[in-house]
Amino acid sequence: MSLPESPHSPATLDYALEDPHQGQRSREKSKATEVMADMFDGRLEPIVFPPPRLPEEGVAPQDPADGGHTFHILVDAGRSHGAIKAGQEVTPPPAEGLEAASASLTTDGSLKNGFPGEETHGLGGEKALETCGAGRSESEVIAEGKAEDVKPEECAMFSAPVDEKPGGEEMDVAEENRAIDEVNREAGPGPGPGPLNVGLHLNPLESIQLELDSVNAEADRALLQVERRFGQIHEYYLEQRNDIIRNIPGFWVTAFRHHPQLSAMIRGQDAEMLSYLTNLEVKELRHPRTGCKFKFFFQRNPYFRNKLIVKVYEVRSFGQVVSFSTLIMWRRGHGPQSFIHRNRHVICSFFTWFSDHSLPESDRIAQIIKEDLWSNPLQYYLLGEDAHRARRRLVREPVEIPRPFGFQCG
């Protein structure tokens, strides 16, 4: 099967007649083309591409019917092979656009410019046949065709730019944006408060709060253990103190009457009833912060039948404090003195504090007894004793009178 040959111009035919070697090489290449066609079993199909236009010359492409040159590229239906121009050259397929097409330039341009390029392109065709027969890849064939058949000047003439540069306005806008970014980067954050990422700050804040809660809980447990440990030692010394106070008659009534705040409540009948008080105990409840308990131990007396009167204060939910006490069983003809008139002021009596839980000063009285009187009753008991002792010690000391000058010894 033979490929159709493109028509030659008269200049090309004259050149072939003048050079016998050139005609022989053309016949050899025609035979090689027929051999290649027989090898491919008719699978090659000719595709005609118009010749590329030279932008420098400004010449319109010629029609093949008018004697112009036509590029013939053989395309295999199964795989790609190098293109063979009938009688002149072998060129690679136009896989790379204008650059690949520039590599298949014929010798006509060279002849017009006075350069005998037929021999060079003939050798390139033979090399292309050899590479196709050896089973080399299409990219290698294209590379060799570019290196041997095409000059750098011709490649530059037919090559077209792939990436278009932005226009003048686009370049100005890009440079302006780049300058603004650089100025903002150098200036840094402004003085005003920026947008706050609340979630970014809440997460570490929550973790810190959890750590604080854990530390507080651990401190409470440690404090409770310390209170229990030293509470046992404290109870031991309190028992010894109570044993001694029981043997001192009128100890607690004296301490109450000498206290600067509680003494106003103890007048008349209350003082007589407190004279039968033998012991006072103040104890914390099971949990120290939930309340306390007051225990008053009495001897047999003509006023009431109780030997133990208890008043309890409890701290319940939401910080509410409630109190309740033992019901006092009064003897016939006796009862609590509700109020005491002193200096035009009405003051509740001490035993009213046991029965009336609605008094405004009830909690204040309990706090004074717990934190001041009971913690150190000796200091208030000794106030009366020290004053009595101070009055007894008050003695007039003699005053030394100086003698006259004449009676002095020489």
From Swiss-Prot:
Extract the Gene3D superfamilies matched here.
1.20.5.1500, Nucleosome assembly protein
Question: Is Phosphoprotein given among the entry's keywords?
Answer: yes
GO CC: one term?
chromatin
Q: Name one GO biological process term.
A: nucleosome assembly
* MF terms in GO: chromatin binding; histone binding
Region span, Disordered? 1-31, 46-69
Its domain of life reads Eukaryota
One matching Pfam family, short form? NAP
Q: Which residues carry this modification: Phosphoserine?
A: 9
- Composition bias, kind Basic and acidic residues: at what positions? 18-31
Entry keyword set = Phosphoprotein
Q: Does the keyword S-adenosyl-L-methionine apply?
A: no
> Which InterPro entries does the UniProt entry name for this protein?
NAP-like_sf, NAP_family
Q: Provide the family line.
A: Belongs to the nucleosome assembly protein (NAP) family.
The record ties this protein, via PANTHER family, to: TESTIS-SPECIFIC Y-ENCODED PROTEIN (PTHR11875)
Task: Report what the protein is called.
Answer: Testis-specific Y-encoded-like protein 6
